[in-house]
Structures are given as C-alpha cells and as structure tokens.
C-alpha cells in the first residue's frame, strides 16, 4: 500500500467497541468533549492502516456479478497508477488500484471512492480498507483527488464549493479516461464516498443516475435542495451514518464541533425520506441486519428495483465503519464492515 501524502502523522487505534443498539431514529452527541470544541479535520486522517487484517461482518445481498462485456486493445494491467485528466481547465487526478486478477479482455466492476473534506485520495484508500476488498473480489477502485481537498457537493464543502468547481463533469471526464485505459463493464460502475465525498455521492445519484448503478454515501447527507435533485431513473442507495456524528449531525443542523464552515446540514432522516419517496418504495422499512451497534434497515418494492438501505451506528461518530478509525470525531464501529456491505450492495445493483 502506498503511503498517504499527509503532513501530520497520528497514531490511530482500531475502531471502537460496540454498544447496545438503539432502534430509533433519534441521535444526539454523547461525548461532552465535542461540545464547543474545534478540530482541524486534516489532523484526523490516516497515514497508515494500523490493523490491515481487520474484518467485520456485513449483511448479505443477492449478488449479480456475471458479465459478458468484453474489450480489446486495453493497454494497462494490474497494479497502481495515477489516472490524469483535464477537466474544466484544471489538471485532475485519481489514484487507481487494480487487482492482480484483472483481465484486460473482460469487463471489470469499477468503484469510485471520494475522500472527505481536508482528506486525500490516499487517506480514503487507507481508511476504507478497500484495496484489500478489491484484491479479494476483483473489482477496480479509483480514488479521485478533490481541488483543495474538497468537493462541490451542492451546498458543501470548502474551496470546490465556493469556487464552483464542476466535480460532476470531472467525474464524467475521469470515467472516460479510465474506460479508455481499462476494460470496465459500463453496467457495473458505482460511487461511494466519506463525509464531503458522501455528499458528492448523493449529488452524483441526482445527476449521474444514467452512469452509476448505485451510490453508497458514508457520513454524508444530501447537499442540495431536494427540488433540484432529479435523477433520470430511480437509483439504489446504501447509506451509513453514526447517531452521534459530531461533524455531520444525524438530525441535521450545525456541527457539534467547529470545522470552520458555517453550514447547516440536512438531517439523515430527511435525506432518506427523499430517496425513499423519489424511488417510489412501497414496502415499509424492515431490519435486515443487526449486530452490536450496527442496524441496517431496508425500504424495498421500489421502482426499478432501486432499494434504499440505511445502516445506522448507535453512538457512532464521523467514521467509516469497519475501517481505520479517525481520532477526535467519535466512535468507529467494528460491528459491521461498510466496505464489504457496500461492495455486496453494488454487486446486487448493476445499471439496468
């Protein structure tokens, strides 16, 4: 695994221990140290995985992984490299991880994983532990870099937002470059992301449902007005969020810690309600997974099979469940693997 290009190296413990499950929606901060505090989020991101063999359980989804998509003339093979692209007059890059099982003649699944605010693609690579999953399951991962370590996700965050960077067009340009170099199955392209990258995942669900089979935001909410989110088709959504997230509060509002942005976030329940209504889900919510502090609820019988699943973490902080824990921002669960759950969900929801 390549080293993360971060300026501050911190000791990172493994994800925290589990606690009793709270079946309700309501969540409030439980750590008094969050109240009135402040944090430089750049200080919280990982430079190395302290426990690369860690694993956690995940719910099962019916996989649909077979593909008949084939290619000729693709020149790049397995390993890691930087995919460089010009978009909107800006030089952009994504770090690629391609498993050794990759066959340049057969369509591979592609996951685009967006980092959090003040983070980097390298940090997302380490925090999510997605490379290990990629090697085991044979899919390709792209870890894009945001301008000034941020993404324009509609109403958030940083210089990309205030400067009007077009990260949707960047995503389209990046996918074009990746597909020119690798054999990618166009029906198995997916988006996930953490925090600001989770916000962007929601936005891509609104604006690129014709490209992505499904989205899986972690610790992010819908960052644009619901009235402006008009997917071309119902898109499956898998969402992760901690009930005690101090950065993007579960019930919305301003962060419980000072992250240097005067933003009022939409709540997780409101975000989920939007997707459930947008996808026309008819079945009442059903619990499909419960282990320790992790509970996953599914809304099904949705238009086009676009199920909505929400995994909430009791007392969970601003974390990637089952991943490398970030200090300062609350508890990280070991009772579910966000990465394994996301990949299983993606495999079950190819583009129609």
How would you describe each model-predicted region?
Residues 1-9:
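Sec-dependent signal peptide recognition
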Residues 12-14:
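C-terminal motif of bacterial Sec signal peptides marking the signal peptidase cleavage site
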Residues 16-30, 34-52, 56-110, 192-222, ...:
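A domain-start/cap signature at the N-terminus of enzymes
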Residues 80, 84-190, 194, 199-203, ...:
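Serine-hydrolase catalytic machinery in alpha/beta-hydrolase-like enzymes
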Residues 112-114, 218, 313:
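Alpha/beta-hydrolase
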Residues 126, 250-257, 262-277, 290-299, ...:
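Short alpha-helix in the alpha/beta-hydrolase fold that links the catalytic acid
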Residues 239-241, 245:
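Short beta-strand/loop motif that positions the catalytic acidic residue
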Residues 245-248, 318-320:
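Acidic catalytic loop of the alpha/beta-hydrolase fold
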């Amino acid at each position: 695994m390549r080293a993360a290009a971060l300026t501050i190296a911190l000791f990172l413990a493994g994800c925290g221990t589990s606690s009793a499950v709270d079946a309700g929606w309501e969540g409030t901060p439980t750590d008094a140290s969050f109240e009135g505090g402040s944090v430089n989020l750049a200080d919280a991101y990982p430079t190395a995985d302290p426990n690369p063999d860690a694993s956690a359980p995940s719910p099962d989804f019916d996989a649909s992984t077979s593909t008949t998509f084939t290619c000729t003339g693709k020149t790049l093979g397995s390993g890691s490299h930087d995919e460089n692209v010009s978009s909107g007059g800006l030089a952009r890059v994504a770090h690629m991880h391609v498993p050794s099982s990759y066959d340049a003649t057969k369509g591979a699944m592609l996951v685009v994983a967006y980092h959090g605010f003040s983070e980097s693609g390298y940090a997302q690579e380490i925090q999510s532990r997605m490379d290990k999953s990629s090697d085991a399951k044979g899919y390709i991962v792209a870890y894009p870099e945001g301008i000034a370590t941020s993404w324009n996700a509609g109403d958030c965050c940083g210089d990309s937002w205030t400067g009007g960077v077009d990260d949707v067009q960047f995503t389209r340009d990046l996918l074009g470059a990746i597909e020119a170099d690798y054999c990618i199955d166009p029906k198995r392209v997916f988006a996930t992301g953490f925090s600001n990258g989770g916000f962007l995942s929601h936005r891509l669900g609104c604006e690129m449902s014709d490209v992505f089979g499904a989205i899986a935001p972690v610790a992010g909410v819908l960052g644009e007005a619901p009235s402006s989110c008009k997917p071309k088709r119902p898109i499956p959504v898998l969402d992760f969020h901690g009930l005690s997230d101090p950065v993007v509060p579960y019930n919305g509002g301003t962060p419980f810690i000072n992250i240097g942005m005067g933003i009022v976030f939409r709540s997780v329940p409101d975000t989920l309600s939007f997707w459930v209504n947008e996808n026309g889900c008819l079945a009442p919510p059903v619990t499909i997974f419960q282990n320790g502090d992790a509970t996953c609820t599914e809304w099904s019988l949705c238009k086009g099979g676009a199920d909505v699943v929400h995994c909430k973490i009791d007392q969970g902080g601003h974390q990637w469940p089952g991943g490398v824990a970030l200090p300062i921002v609350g508890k990280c669960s070991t009772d579910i693997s966000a990465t394994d759950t996301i990949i299983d969900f993606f495999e079950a929801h190819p583009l129609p």
